[in-house]
Amino acid sequence: MGKLLRKPLNERIAPGVTLVQDINQANSPLSYVGFRLIEMEKGAIYQEELTELECCIVALTGKITVSEGNDIFPEIGTRANVFEKIPTDSVFISGGRAFQVKADTEKARVALCYSPANQDLPTTLIKASDNSIEQRGKYQNKRLVHNILPDVSEVASSLLVVEVYTNGGNFSSYPPHKHDRDNLPAESLLEESYYHEINPEQGFIFQRVYTDERTLDETMAVEHQNAVIVPEGYHPVGVPDGYDSYYLNVMAGPNRVWKFHNDPDHEWILERD
């Protein structure tokens, strides 16, 4: 299956551009999902030509200018730190196009989320105000969700992107759920990646990835700027007291529908008053 936990690479790939995470088909068990995290210094430029993939560029922190053809989106981005817990701006770019990202602030952190380009779609600015915001769960199962590219959006052809905040002492992606069977309308097949940040940064969270048969069963202590790959199975997250969790999810599969199946052993928690 390969290693599911990915530590930061911190490789300089261009002047002022550091590659922190790089998940793709060649270095992972994933067939649909790709993910890159780059950190940029002011004035630095990152360029990429997409072929068969579409991409959502998320301005995690700082301000950036994104250019594709005649489309230029100047100084997008809304926060200096993800733990401001406000939505941010993103840009969707379809396959077969080239784009450029330029850092406009002293530092910028940018997520690049990839999946197969099944249609030729317009380059689109997804404003922070376009994000739908949800408060999910109760008891010690509360989380704040920013939907960047939900399955109801028609901006992308296969890509799903969401941000999730979980306070200390809470669980998220819980009760454990999975989406690894192409069995609609009961369940959809979606691979997933998690990019994690933790506040304060010296903290850690726990994430378990497991299947019903336990042919895959891996529990990880996940630190700041680690990534976790979820090719299949349930994938709950637990956050220790005193620390807050942020993660960015990228999902994709044969159908752009998020339909999950809860672990029946733990679904009872949803039935509480």
Curated annotation (Swiss-Prot):
Its EC number is 5.3.1.30. The keyword Aminoacyl-tRNA synthetase does not apply. Pathway: Polyol metabolism; myo-inositol degradation into acetyl-CoA; acetyl-CoA from myo-inositol: step 4/7. It is an enzyme of class 5 (isomerase). Gene3D superfamilies: Jelly Rolls. InterPro entries: Deoxy-glucuronate_isom_IolB (IPR024203), IolB_Bacilli (IPR023770), KduI/IolB_isomerase (IPR021120), RmlC-like_jellyroll (IPR014710), RmlC_Cupin_sf (IPR011051). One of its GO terms (biological process) is inositol catabolic process. The keyword DNA repair does not apply. This is 5-deoxy-glucuronate isomerase. Keywords: Isomerase. It catalyses: 5-deoxy-D-glucuronate = 5-dehydro-2-deoxy-D-gluconate. GO terms for molecular function: 5-deoxy-D-glucuronate isomerase activity; glucuronate isomerase activity.
